[in-house]
Amino acid sequence: MYRFCKGLRNCLQWKKSTFNLYNTPQMENVTLKRIAEVLGLSISTVSRALKNHPDISTATKKRVNEIAEFLDYEPNINAINLRAKSNRVLGLIVPTISGFFYDSFIAAVEEECRLNDYRLMILQSGNDPQIEINNLSICRQNRVSGLFVCLSINTNSMAAFDKFKEADIPLIFFDKVPDGENYNKVCIADMEAAKMAAAMLIEKKKKKILSLFGSKSLSISRRRLEAYNNVMLREQDVVIDVEHCSSTQEARNITKQYFSKKEKPDAVFCMSDEILIGVMKSLNEMKIDIPSKAGVISLSDGFLPSIYTPEITYIETSGYKLGKLAFTRMMNCMDNKNEPVELFTNSPFVSGGSL
């Protein structure tokens, strides 16, 4: 008891010394060595006590943990990783964090990281290929154990990504993915979702449809357009106007352009939430009644359609489900099941009042 009280007194004196005359904290990391000095124990005993080692008595564990908590001790993760020759950090690069799809994807991955004792480092590319390359460099410098990437719309070279493959670091592409069979990819069931939307427009007897897709450079846009056209082009009395847009503002401008014409569309298909925002902004500004004057259907994560009146009919493209699938694939890759595969989530139809 005397030894513990003496240790606590030393601890209080040391903690007091970390504050200057103006009570401003002088940042000093609490180490195992410092805790050992305070308690008069060896560093190895302190370390094992904090790890709840069976060779350490309950009383000693209690003393060590109380002092560690009092001093706000935090383990040195870098030192632990160095000893274990591993780094339980995963990187995640997205074009932007804002946006319901990416938010929900990140939430799912972060949730799984927490449950599996990983940390997550999130970086934004802003759809700038140079920033994307810089982010890859940051991930390599931090020795991430694996990396999730949604490509920027302007990515035109995979050379920087291939360095991760050469270093045997698992790399999972999601949503906006590269062409080819040499990469691990997790995707929404793009083609099925687009087919479902096209079939629903036909079922609702829409005849002149403004169809808005993402950038032509993205495989996700090309796949969705191909599947959509395969359904639509079988209908000889249906006119589809296909446009590509890479931003909400561009979608807004295109929608305004088409609904300013004498022969207006009677429906709009939106390939993504980003496009849907621009479309709805324009239709509301022009006072186009939905669905009597124009129907709207979108591929969506599901949150955005619920904020409009009437609610938007959509095909679900869940970022949360995709995030869960991506993490599972990452764990499989780390278990040496790293042969490139392309996995898909399902895309259910959700009826609103907009069609």
Enumerate the language-model features and the residues they cover:
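Alpha-helical recognition/docking segments in bacterial nutrient-uptake
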Residues: 2-27, 31, 85-199, 259-260
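N-terminal helix-turn-helix DNA-binding module of bacterial transcription factors
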Residues: 2-87, 355
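Glycine-rich phosphate-binding loop signature in dinucleotide/nucleotide-binding domains
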Residues: 71, 141-143, 204-205, 258-264
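Hinge/beta->alpha junction and helix N-cap segments in small-molecule ligand-binding domains
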Residues: 95-104, 122-131, 176, 185-196, ...
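Short helix-capping segments at alpha-helix termini
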Residues: 115-116, 167, 232-238, 261-264, ...
